[in-house]
Swiss-Prot record:
UniProt record similarity statement: Belongs to the class-I aminoacyl-tRNA synthetase family.
Protein name: Arginine--tRNA ligase
Coiled-coil regions, chain positions: none
Annotated catalysed reactions: tRNA(Arg) + L-arginine + ATP = L-arginyl-tRNA(Arg) + AMP + diphosphate
Cellular component GO terms, alphabetical: cytoplasm
Molecular function terms, GO-annotated: arginine-tRNA ligase activity; ATP binding
'HIGH' region (motif): residue ranges: 134-144
Origin species: Syntrophomonas wolfei subsp. wolfei (strain DSM 2245B / Goettingen)
Keywords: Aminoacyl-tRNA synthetase, ATP-binding, Cytoplasm, Ligase, Nucleotide-binding, Protein biosynthesis
Gene that encodes it: argS
Localization per record: Cytoplasm
Amino acid sequence: MNPIQKVLASLHSMVIEALEKAKSRDLIKFDQIPEFLIEVPREKEHGDFACNVALLMARQARQAPRAIAEVLVELMEASGRPVEKIEIAGAGFINFFLDRSWLYEIPLMVYKSKDKYGFNGEKAKKVQVEFVSANPTGNLHMGNARGGAIGDTLANILERAGYEVEREFYINDAGNQIEIFTDSMEARYLQLTGHDVQFPENGYAGRDLIDTVRNIIARYGEGLYDLPREERRQIIVDFALEEKIDYIQKTLASFGINYDVWFSEKSLHENGKIMAVFNDLRDKGYIYESEGAWWFKSTAFGDEKDEVVLRANGMPTYFMADIAYHQNKFERGFDWVINVWGADHHGHVARMKGAIEALGYDPARLDILLMQLVRLYRGGNIVRMSKRTGTTVSLDELIEDVGKDAARFFFVMRSPDSHLDFDLELARQKSQENPVYYVQYAHARICSIFRQARAEGITMAEINEIDISCLKEEEELAILRKIADFPEEISIAARTLAPHRIARYVLDLAALFHSFYNHHRVLNDNRALQDARLLLMEITRITIHNALDVLGVAAPEQM
C-alpha cells in the first residue's frame, strides 16, 4: 500500500466509524453508506484531503449536508491517525488537515525503493496495448508520432501499476490500401525504367516511394517488366512492404518504442480467420445480406447505421478484418485490450465494441483511447511540409530536429483528447521555458549538489540516523507531499488511461524543487539539517528519474 493509500484508508475508516456511531445513536438515519470520495482539494486552505460524504447522505438522511457533517466531525476519533484538525467548509465538505508524521515516513521508503518507487510489483492482469499501427505505405507522420508516445507511455504506466503488458503493432499489409500501394509502386517502377504509363489518380505519391522503387531497380534491374504482371506486382510489393516495415521498426526504436508483437493483417486472410468469424456472426444472426453485400447489425449495439463487412465482390472489408483481429486478441488471453486511435476513427468505436459483444465478450474489456491532431509550429507559423521531402514532416525528421526526449515529452504533455500545438523552436531551447529541459535540469541540478558535496568531502549520514523532522520549511514539506503522491498518480493514470498526468506531475515536482533550490541551501553549517536536505534531494532525484523513465525520457546527470 502506497503512502497516500495508507492515509486514505485511515481517513476512510474514520468516516465509516463515525457514520456507524451516528446511526446507532439515531443521529443520522440512513439505509446504506454511499460511495463517497476523499481527495486532495483544489485550494490549499481546504486542508490536505476533503470528503463529500455529508453531501451524498443528505437525501436519504433528510438532513442538511452541513448538519450531517457537524455530527460526523463530532464523532470522529482522530487518535492514532495523522490528523491535526478537521473542519467543515461550504455546504458540508469535511476537510482533514494532517500533521507531518505521515510525511516523515516517505523519505526512508523512497530511498529504499529507489527505481522501484511508485510501482506495484504484482502482475495483476494481462493487458495488450496496440498503438501506431500505421499503414506501411509511407513515412510515419505526426499523428503516428503522438500515438507512439501516448501508447508507449501508457504501456509503461500499466507495467508500473502492476499489469502484465504486451505492446503490439498491427501491420495493415492486406486490403484495398495495399492494392493502391501496389498500383503506385508498379507505375513508378515502369516510369523509372522508361515505360510510358499513367500514375494512378488515387495513388501514393510520396517521394520516399521513389527511393524505394530505385532500391527495387538496384536489386532486380529493369527485367521485372518482362515477367507476368502478377508476378511482377508481387515482387514489387513484397520488397516495398519489407523496406517500409523495416523503416517503421527502426524509426520507432529510435523513438524508444520496442514492440513485443508485430501482427500481420494478411495472416488473418491466409489462415481463414476472417471468414470463420464472419460465418460465426452470420450464424448468430448479426450479419445479413442486402444489396449484394453482407452487413453487420451494428445498430443493434447503439451505432447509427449498419456496416458492410463483405463486399459484393466477395472481399471482406477492413472492419471485418478488424473484428477477426480483435477476436484473436481475446483468444490470446488478454484481460484488457487497449487501442490508441486517431480521433478520425471515433465512428468506428461503437461498432467495434458492438462486434466484441456479438462475439460473446464483455465490451468493457476493450478500451479505445482517441487522440486529437498535432500542429507543428516554428516561429509562430504552422509547418505544413517537410523541406526535405515536400510532404508532411516525418517522425524521423522530428527526432533529428528536436531529439527523442523533447518529442516524447511534448506529445504526452496534453490530454490525448486535446489538440496539440507543437512548438519546434521551444522544444529545441535549452532554457527553463522548455518543459522537458525544465524537468531534466531539475534532475541534473540535484546531481550537481551531490558532486559538490563529494568535492567538499561531505557525505550524507546513514539513512536511519537522519532526523527527518528537521524538514520544516513549507517548500520542503510541499516536496514531500508531492513525492508521496507519485504512486497514486501512477495508479490513477493507469485506471483512467491518462499518460499526460505523469508529465504534469513531474513538471509540478520539478517546479517545487526549483523553488526550494532558489530559497534554501542544501549544503550548510547545520549538520542535521544538511543530512535531512541531502536525503530530500536524493528522494526527489529518484522520483523525477522514475517519472521520466515512465515517459521514456532520459534523466541526465549533467546539462
